[in-house]
């Protein structure tokens, strides 16, 4: 109830800002209903990655108890799975209320695109790949280690995907995550390839690594990664290197991230150790969107 009240209050403020007075909504013509329903459908398909295999229908549009808004039922069919949800929508289809307040003329992932910095961070895959996956990870995170083979398989099989890795060491619960993140940055400064080999080593040997043996293992690994050992050691103690990791942490905080792994597939969020199929679905959907040119902007 509080959340609904907050949404209604936010809507009232928006209407006021637009110079609109809350008045009783007049019935929409059939043509208006069709246009609004289509706009809502396009936006929801984009928001939830519903491709052509998912049936989406907006029906039963009528005046709601909230002045200036119409109530509509969104029906969703995915094979044998069916569901429906009541939403509120403005007469022009611009504003949609479903727990959160949405402006259907804006990209719901615009804030992510504006916040995430890709340049200067480890990446793997074609530079011109149409799908970019950003992973915020923690080398000590068990769930990240579970995701690791999935991402490795994905990058081996797909040539239309680029992965950008960003640090999100959860220092409150992981005692060597920050040191590992700093080591990763040091390896990256000498060689992007060395970073990815270190990345693989840390996840593949995560259970054997401790706070006490991390430095010893990193030093022993350096020659195998073709790293200049003294430079690698010095870098791991420098505040400037740690500052790079902390900048990534601030970025993650701005995005509201609290757990790892957290993925963004062309800015679309996906949390946790997702299955190969779940990630592939979003990749295929993004490629479909680009082909159709139908993403709302």
Predicted regions and their residues:
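Bacterial N-terminal signal peptides
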Residues: 7-19
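Positively charged n-region of N-terminal signal peptides that target proteins for export
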Residues: 1-4
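C-terminal cap of thioredoxin/glutaredoxin-like
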Residues: 26-98, 219-297
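Structural alpha/beta surface segment adjacent to cysteine/selenocysteine redox centers
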Residues: 134-223, 228, 253-258, 285, ...
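Sec/Tat signal peptide C-region and signal peptidase I cleavage site
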Residues: 20-25
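A short beta-strand-turn-helix
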Residues: 115-131, 155
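A short, surface-exposed interaction/processing loop segment used at functional sites
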Residues: 91-122
């Amino acid at each position: 109830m509080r959340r609904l009240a907050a949404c209604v209050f936010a809507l009232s403020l928006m209407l006021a800002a637009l110079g609109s007075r809350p008045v009783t909504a007049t019935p929409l013509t059939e043509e208006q209903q069709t246009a609004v329903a289509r706009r809502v459908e396009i936006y929801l398909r984009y928001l939830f990655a519903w491709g052509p295999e998912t049936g989406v229908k907006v029906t039963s549009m009528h005046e709601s108890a909230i002045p200036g808004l119409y109530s509509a039922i969104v029906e969703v069919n995915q094979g044998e799975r069916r569901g429906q949800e009541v939403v509120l929508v403005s007469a022009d289809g611009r504003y949609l209320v479903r727990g959160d307040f949405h402006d259907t003329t804006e990209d719901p992932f615009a804030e992510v695109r504006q916040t995430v910095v890709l340049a200067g961070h480890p990446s793997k895959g074609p530079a011109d790949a149409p799908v970019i996956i950003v992973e915020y990870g923690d080398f000590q995170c068990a769930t990240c280690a579970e995701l690791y083979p999935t991402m490795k398989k994905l990058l081996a099989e797909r040539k239309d995907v680029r992965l950008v890795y960003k640090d999100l060491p959860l220092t409150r619960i992981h005692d060597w995550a920050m040191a590992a993140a700093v080591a990763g940055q040091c390896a990256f400064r000498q060689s992007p390839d060395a970073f990815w080999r270190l990345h693989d080593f840390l996840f593949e040997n995560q259970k054997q690594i401790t706070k006490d043996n991390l430095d010893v293992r990193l030093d022993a690994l350096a020659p195998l990664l073709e790293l200049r050992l003294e430079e690698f050691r010095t870098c791991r103690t420098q505040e400037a290197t740690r500052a790079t990791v902390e900048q990534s942490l601030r970025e993650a905080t701005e995005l509201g991230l609290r757990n790892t792994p957290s993925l963004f597939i062309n800015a679309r969020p996906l949390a946790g150790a997702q299955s190969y199929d779940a990630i592939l679905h979003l990749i295929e959907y993004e490629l479909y969107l680009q082909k159709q040119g139908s993403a709302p902007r």
